[in-house]
Amino acid sequence: MVKRYAVILAAGQGTRMKSKLYKVLHPVCGKPMVQHVVDQVSKLGVEKTIAVVGFGAEQVKEQLGAQCEYALQEKQLGTAHAVMQAAPHLQNLEGITIVVCGDTPLITAETMEALLEHHMTAGAKATVLTAIADDPTGYGRIVRNSDGHVEKIVEHKDANEQEREIREINTGTYCFDNRMLFQALTKVTNNNAQGEYYLTDVIEIIKADGGIVSAYQAPSFDETIGINDRIALAEAERIMRDRICRQHMKNGVTIIDPACTYISAEATIGRDTVIYPGTVIEGKTVIGEDCTIGPHSEIKNCHIGHRTSIRHSVAHDSEIGDDVTIGPFAHIRPLSKIDDEVRIGNFVEVKKSTFGKGSKASHLSYIGDAEVGADVNLGCGSITVNYDGVHKYRTKIEDGAFIGCNANLIAPVTIGQGAYVAAGSTVTDDVPGRALAIGRARQVNKENYVDRLRGKKKS
């Protein structure tokens, strides 16, 4: 078995992005573009993956961690110069090296695997991944010989009229015999207008030395798009989003309007779940089977069980069980845990709280820093008053408690098992189990008050 290696070019600053964030760290569907590339390369069975880093090296290393070894390109002097920085890691090894740009997040493991296999079958020393472009302006053109191998790569500015008609372009992804690659790199010069060392010159050197230079055509130009500005970033986002939605639909998820649905690359969704338009599913969210999500809901890093409905609502960094109903217009804030068969209704905010099985907060409530037991009913306008201006305090509501409408529970406080809190109460002390707490002023009716009031106004 021939050993495989990978070099990922991730040193560019990306000035056209006009951003403080380094280019390869810009996210596509929630994942940095270089992470997309590394994740796909990891499926190829490579012995080593070398990430060539430069601008933002520490941030790139922090993102990729132990998935890669690293080579530093201190000065950006061209693509051949970048690959040369990987020499201490690879130059004396036998095998095949694939070179991929870190700003091509749409490339797939399937296409790279096909490139590697074609390289072996063709007996090539170098193989170029090509693509057919509708508009090849600005790309290097692939000129093939009668055997179908690469005769030369002609840059757009150097191409004659006939060559400019060619729509097969160089994508910037290559496969090389590893030893020959690093031998050829020592012969590359910077005798050009930009004074840079170009990897395309390696192709010419290998060909001049008698090596076969082959080409493998990618199934879709979209896979090969390089991200150099925000316009290309948005296009890659659109393509990736469509790809993600299609994969979920193939797996049994109904997405009513994929064009109006955002699902991160790391989300998992069970079959027979329905996603309505305007829904945003971010991070490593897991959604079970037979759920209804949306319309217009935002879910981030949540774990959601089966048969749960979330409509017109926001949920972040929380656990939500089976058969739960959330919304419309509810907000589940981080570190909340909602057990099975719970209802969180309209205009209810839950913050860093737990709800036991079967409990309900159906309307206009704030439940923060609370432990709510099972089968608890929180009436309209229930508030856990958790903040005194300096510290946060917790409220505990035990199983079966009933909290009347417009009740304020001043934390720290415990409402005992099966206890009742009367509507309109402000509760400052613990309530024993099965007791009724009434914390409000007694009603006083003033007879004939309105007549006296109106009489004063007339006079």
UniProtKB/Swiss-Prot annotation:
Acetyl-CoA binds at residues 386-387, 423, 440. Pfam families: Hexapep, NTP_transferase. Residues 1-230 are annotated as: Pyrophosphorylase. It is an enzyme of class 2 (transferase). SUPFAM superfamilies: Nucleotide-diphospho-sugar transferases, Trimeric LpxA-like enzymes. Residues 231-251 are annotated as: Linker. This is Bifunctional protein GlmU. The gene is glmU.
